[in-house]
């Protein structure tokens, strides 16, 4: 059963944080535009954006060591860390604007202040962390960071981690109190509640089956209404594909030249969750370690305080798993179905190149509960098996493409916008830092897809996001003012004490 074509201005595919952010920006910039959202699941924020399906870190490179690499002369390259931090500041500013404008309420339901810490062991790693601390401390975005290699200080900062430690190996940590824990699931649901009040049409249990170009230049989206079983056809001038791991297969259906020679490799994440509330209360930070030599960036171990359903939780991970599904709720045929004549060589080249990743995934899949406990005990020496359960988090599809620097079949560890030359359709691919940089990434979509509107929109964008187009690193006074004002609006300025 098929019905007539239904026209609209904008179609957003996927009801996650990315579509929620883009929809919110567009409703502020072009309130008269009609927007329709199609989501396969029964509600918003249930896949990658769901609070149990990601680490909930407000990624601002305060503690993630993979954003600061060591050069051959021992100096530290902080350029990536600065970039990630600048991008997170845009998210903070937009969220603060939404709260201040009363478009969303109760910021404590989606963002909480939480110290971000890095922790290392061994003389060489201690020196690396000290060098990193010194390099970052010169940058205004990282003011307030502390370094210590004193066991007494570390016991105060990290009581749970330091208790029962018998090794005399040198240890060091950095600590910064301006970190955050973000519940992206709650934020996504809030944004869609706001969009509903702006007459955005939210269609849940609607699966997008195909996307094709019409003769008059519009995009026709074929949608299966899973409630009624009917097939619908919707057309729009602009389509955004924000379906997490499901974006790649939909992008391939568009047939745009930019969709060729791109592949995807799914990796699932697993976390250990503490079920002993007494243990949970002894830790109050996100603590990131250093990835083991040869392990991919996604494997950086971290012990995180989380706030989920207004309750404090403690998670450790990630451990990697493998499933051929591109979404947690996807199909076992997703991976094989994404291999096309135009990307098969790219995929094969990646297979040869990434033997290290393949080996790592095989080792991870084979881990028993006790083996995972051994890894946890590197963080919490006294951890008891009976206190910890394993939860399967979300699927992440790492992008594989041909690059000038890496050659054919290069694995990308990041978030990437792919758009048609005329800006009529865009898709978001990739993984970390993901949700934290949603505002930056969606501004990139606007710049790529609506270049002729940017001059007209710039004033409103700067009202919502004052540092848009400005380097905060080069404007420390502006950074300080914005950090203070957004912190006040989002309830982040109250320095929380470490639970001893």
Curated annotation (Swiss-Prot):
Q: Name one GO biological process term.
A: tricarboxylic acid cycle
Name a GO molecular-function annotation: L-malate dehydrogenase (quinone) activity
The protein's UniProt keywords, in alphabetical order, are: FAD, Flavoprotein, Oxidoreductase, Tricarboxylic acid cycle
Give the metabolic or biological pathway.
Answer: Carbohydrate metabolism; tricarboxylic acid cycle; oxaloacetate from (S)-malate (quinone route): step 1/1
Name this protein carries in UniProt: Probable malate:quinone oxidoreductase
Q: Which Pfam families match?
A: Mqo
The enzyme's first-digit EC class, named in words, is oxidoreductase
What protein family does this chain belong to? Belongs to the MQO family.
Taxon lineage:
Bacteria, Bacillati, Bacillota, Bacilli, Bacillales
Superkingdom of origin: Bacteria
Q: What is its EC number?
A: 1.1.5.4
- Cofactor(s) needed by this chain: FAD
Q: Which reaction does it catalyse?
A: (S)-malate + a quinone = a quinol + oxaloacetate
Q: Which InterPro entries match?
A: FAD/NAD-bd_sf, MQO
